[in-house]
Amino acid sequence: MIQYKSINHQDTSLAEREEYFKNLEHKDDDSAVLLQTCNRVELYYGNGDVPDEVARHLFRVACGLESAIIGEQAVQGQIKEAYMTAKRTKKLSAGMHKLFESALQIGKRVRSETQ
């Protein structure tokens, strides 16, 4: 099952997020994507099914709904960069590919169809 760990600007300071990033652990044999922005550090990891909660969270992040400034656009590029880095350096599961491809498509669609 694909899971995620997350901390963000709403509940931690920058120093706490930096410390969290340094101490993040997961099994090296797991499929994983590390998303780090100014306001959040998230690790998506695992194989298999994607629970609705995980997909919903990443989709909200991709749409800018979880950003300090709602609708912020830079997060879309940051998600793509994290995904592409993981794709180049790790063996990603089919579920992880689908999750991130879907998030990028949804983020793009929301930005093109809303004001």
Which positions does each model-derived feature cover?
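Short glycine-/aliphatic-rich beta-strand segments at the starts of folded cytosolic domains
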Residues: 1-21
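Short beta-strand segments
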Residues: 6-8, 35, 78
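Short amphipathic beta-strand starts and helix->beta connectors
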Residues: 23-31
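Amphipathic alpha-helical segments at domain termini/boundaries
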Residues: 36, 50-52
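A generic structural motif
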Residues: 39-46
